[in-house]
């Protein structure tokens, strides 16, 4: 019996506003427990929420970037449930009238394009955090940190259009890239700024009704999402094949074992007893505001990728790599302002710059070689001042010291040798030393030419102009 997976994702995006969604408390990560709270965060009687305008603006940005319709009127609702890290006894969210709906994202998996529907995007507040590890002076008891309570979130809910773990990861990566490009979230998955609930069910091929779904909560890495979904698909198929029934439930993924385990029964919407929050008036968004936000949107990764291919003539692979992060794309474009040859710039950014960043675990924004300095290095190559090989040595010194390339070349004596007399002298010495190889070359072993080039370059310590070396060497060997 063949089965097909049906997957829908609920993604929680923590917004990088300075203050919380309904109060003025800081959202800074890593502060002392319960040091960023107020009567609103703590759910004190009589404390009234005040909506953060920036949160609404960020929600509109997310909606426009994911092809959603922006509701001219939306309302906040109370989602009622009890949990120790929810001080009010309810979460302020949106239910019947979310701010964004009916969107989509297009993904590519193994060269095949697919459109994934987005049901809705709504604003809500985050809950606090339970700390179960040993706490000095407390022992084994669980502790509640309410610093995160009232932190602004967007919940982005997909349609059940995904059919594999690979599709789910492709969708998540694209969504993650968009929210980071927009600047509305840092997307830090380790800190919980971008986390996912995966709804998974399986159905027999040919069936017209979805199977019973489970929800795996708060998976916070692309790798773990893939593992959790693949495990859950296999588990559900095994249960059905053994004659059992899938229980609608909430499950947790254990990254250490790679399996999901039952957490609790899965609630339905009516279990939360949603009703409009009486402390918050309906949110009315004018067309003018939406258009102002639209005009302020940055160029999104898909549009940037296509522009790099169409206008700059870059291969698809280069365009994909360079647009992977907004910071990398900004660095590339800043370099182009000083050196208007896209392909060489792309090669160096993807090659030496990325290598150096990875070796030191640096961000591109912290690179000691600025775009202007990299452009100056490429100009030295174009002028014939240094060879491409020597340029890599110069780059390493620039990275270490922050010096300009011309300064490094001068200090290290790395100027390329193009004088034919000097190069010819080196060639003569090499050919005299390798007389046996010369005889073999002249007897028909043309592949030895590369060997001679290498010997000449080594003898010149990489300074000889490769073009001049090739020209003179060919004449000598054919003479």
Swiss-Prot record:
Keywords: ATP-binding, Ligase, Nucleotide-binding, Protein biosynthesis
Catalytic reactions on record: L-glutamyl-tRNA(Gln) + L-glutamine + ATP + H2O = L-glutaminyl-tRNA(Gln) + L-glutamate + ADP + phosphate + H(+); L-aspartyl-tRNA(Asn) + L-glutamine + ATP + H2O = L-asparaginyl-tRNA(Asn) + L-glutamate + ADP + phosphate + 2 H(+)
MF annotations from Gene Ontology: asparaginyl-tRNA synthase (glutamine-hydrolyzing) activity; ATP binding; glutaminyl-tRNA synthase (glutamine-hydrolyzing) activity
Catalytic activity, EC: 6.3.5.-
Keyword 4Fe-4S recorded: no
GO annotation, biological process: glutaminyl-tRNAGln biosynthesis via transamidation; translation
Disulfide bond residue pairs: none
Pfam families in alphabetical order: GatB_N (PF02934), GatB_Yqey (PF02637)
Assembly and interaction partners: Heterotrimer of A, B and C subunits.
HAMAP family per record: GatB
Entry similarity comment: Belongs to the GatB/GatE family. GatB subfamily.
Function text: Allows the formation of correctly charged Asn-tRNA(Asn) or Gln-tRNA(Gln) through the transamidation of misacylated Asp-tRNA(Asn) or Glu-tRNA(Gln) in organisms which lack either or both of asparaginyl-tRNA or glutaminyl-tRNA synthetases. The reaction takes place in the presence of glutamine and ATP through an activated phospho-Asp-tRNA(Asn) or phospho-Glu-tRNA(Gln).
Entries under PANTHER family matching the protein: GLUTAMYL-TRNA GLN AMIDOTRANSFERASE SUBUNIT B MITOCHONDRIAL AND PROKARYOTIC PET112-RELATED, GLUTAMYL-TRNA(GLN) AMIDOTRANSFERASE SUBUNIT B, MITOCHONDRIAL
Record-given protein name: Aspartyl/glutamyl-tRNA(Asn/Gln) amidotransferase subunit B
Originating species: Geotalea daltonii (strain DSM 22248 / JCM 15807 / FRC-32) (Geobacter daltonii)
This protein's encoding gene: gatB
